[in-house]
Amino acid sequence: MAVSTIVPSDYKEQDSTVVLQTAMDLVSNKFHEPVKSTPLVNTVEILEDDSTMVDIPEVIAAPEVTVLPEVITVPEVATIVLPSEEGSSEKIDRSLRLSDVISSVVEPAAGAKKLRKMLLETNELIVCPGVYDGLSARTAMELGFNAMYMTGAGTTASRIGQPDLAIAQLHEMRENAEMIANLDPFGPPLIADMDTGYGGPIMVARTVEQYIRAGVAGAHLEDQVLTKRCGHLSGKKVVSHEEYISRIKAAHAARVRMQSDFVLIARTDALQTLGYDACISRLRAARDEGADVGLLEGFVSKAQAAQAVKDLAPWPLLLNSVENGKSPTITVDEASEMGFRIMIFSFATLAPAYVAIRETLARLKYEGIVGTPKHITPVKLFEVCGLEHSMAVDKNAGGLSFMGGV
């Protein structure tokens, strides 16, 4: 008994084990039966919609999975076989669209793999709006950003109402990052602030491990002292070159132990006190110890930012854009032209949120009305936060809670 397969016209090579396992999982879910598989080459028929029907004849399920080719290409496909009762020759007259399989190959919560793939397979600038809570992250996702950044300043301000002065610690940062990273298991990867790693090498390793388990795609680790402050404040102090590199070593070793694609971003705040050359030296050493990306915080000019990219090429650099901070404002186009690979906007949602909240509350205090725009209804806000998905989950499970709508 075999299941026919329709292959989309734009079907590309896929890892055979991934495609087969995904297909078998889909069939198991559809027919509520365990399945076995075997590869099969057969004829191809072009359908009206330019997809390809692969006609698969009856085959017998083997007790073990046949050895697979390295890749499956059209017309070489996988036959999905359902077990039958002894002596039965009944065929299942249903088809499985391989388009469903291909779309399902994307792995949930594989943010690190997505981010690393973006860095390795494209030369495009990865633009990450700074988000700090569920609504700001949902809004970034609604607008289709390919990646996001969890800002430490925003997390500290929103979760505990404090300034960015090393007050938020690992548990607050990890919990917030985990919530944001898992809003949508198929959503954009999340880069997070990891501050100093919250201690010595042991704590740095623990932080990386917890971030990886939380689904964070990557994080930046800096060289400030433990009593650190926001990178766009004056008076920053940094640890020695040796102590900083020990943090990087610990982070890299933890990532290797976890067998993760977690992207380790080495950040230096030494520009204020030690100068440009010391920053480049620290970043080169971090690169040599396993860091994937560099971040020189607090550029004093656009020319200096462009020079850093040249001095560290071809190693990818991340640019932190904080308007009205210590660095000049650099646009996305300018950063791309300079050769930066990632650009984060730490205050992109935090600062506008404060402005909007303050203006609204002032209107309430002095005019007695909030003045919410007519199109911003409760339903609209809940839709941004996944209302339709939640209703679909209930419906697919046989629930009746939302039959009448909301």
What does each model-found stretch correspond to?
Residues 1-12:
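N-terminal acidic, proline/glycine-rich, low-complexity intrinsically disordered segments
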Residues 46, 61, 81-84, 102-110:
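N-terminal organelle-targeting presequences
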Residues 47, 57, 63, 69, ...:
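Intrinsically disordered, low-complexity proline-rich tandem-repeat tracts
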Residues 93-109, 115, 348-406:
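Extended, intrinsically disordered, low-complexity segments
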Residues 105-118, 122, 126-319, 325-340, ...:
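Alpha/beta enzyme core
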